[in-house]
Amino acid sequence: MPRLIFLGPPGAGKGTQAERLAAIYHTPKISTGDLLRAEVKAQTPLGCQAKVYMDAGELVPDEVLIGMVKGQLQQSPEQGWILDGFPRTLAQAEALEELLQELGQDYDYVLNLEVPDEVVVARLLARGKEQGRSDDADRSVILKRLEVYRQQTAPLIDFYEAKGRLQRVNGNQPMESVQEHLQALLEGFRRTA
């Protein structure tokens, strides 16, 4: 079963593609964004704390996310997993490497969905209207999220490229085309593994 990490700016389609691959391969999708939004919706103490960061377009503290991810990775390791929205910083990537080593797990690919900023902004504004997500409804918050992505998440591209695990994917095309590309990539990996 595949073990994948999705990277890319907000609005690149990571969640959509992760969900599609999870359904095809019967693999759990682990989305820190979904986990955090559930906490916010339930108005738990963690959710209220996280909402402040999310509404400002900032990242939720590492220790919160790492603990959540560890719990998810331990549930059914034989089914594989697809990480969506984690890691987002070099510190998180290094912590994930340590965590996977501790759990005796590894990942197959890091899939970086590449999408131009103007497309990201348009996608997120549309999603904000459709889904009522406060972190997607305000252009200034979206621009802040892109700035945070460039500063904190984009360095992961070099980190994973140096490990020979990064696959760049054009996310600025129809969803079906992106999915077909990802499936072909995974099928090629399964044949050589």
Swiss-Prot record:
* UniProt EC number: 2.7.4.3
Q: Where does the signal sequence lie?
A: none
Q: Which Pfam families match?
A: ADK
Q: Which residues bind AMP?
A: T32, R37, E58, L59, V60, G85, F86, P87, R88, Q92, R133, R145
GO BP terms: namely: AMP salvage
Q: Where is this region: LID?
A: 126-136
Keyword line: ATP-binding, Cytoplasm, Kinase, Nucleotide biosynthesis, Nucleotide-binding, Transferase
Record-annotated residues binding ATP?
G11, A12, G13, K14, G15, T16, R127, Q173
Q: What is this protein called?
A: Adenylate kinase
- Reading the lineage from the top rank, the first entry is Bacteria
Q: Which top class of enzyme applies to this chain?
A: transferase
Q: Output one GO MF annotation.
A: adenylate kinase activity
Task: Describe the task this protein carries out.
Answer: Catalyzes the reversible transfer of the terminal phosphate group between ATP and AMP. Plays an important role in cellular energy homeostasis and in adenine nucleotide metabolism.
What does the similarity note say?
Answer: Belongs to the adenylate kinase family.
Q: What HAMAP family does this protein map onto?
A: Adenylate_kinase_Adk (MF_00235)
Question: Domain notes, please?
Answer: Consists of three domains, a large central CORE domain and two small peripheral domains, NMPbind and LID, which undergo movements during catalysis. The LID domain closes over the site of phosphoryl transfer upon ATP binding. Assembling and dissambling the active center during each catalytic cycle provides an effective means to prevent ATP hydrolysis.
Where does the record place it?
Answer: Cytoplasm
Q: In which pathway does it act?
A: Purine metabolism; AMP biosynthesis via salvage pathway; AMP from ADP: step 1/1
Annotated region NMP: the residues are 31-60
Reactions catalysed, semicolon-separated, are: AMP + ATP = 2 ADP
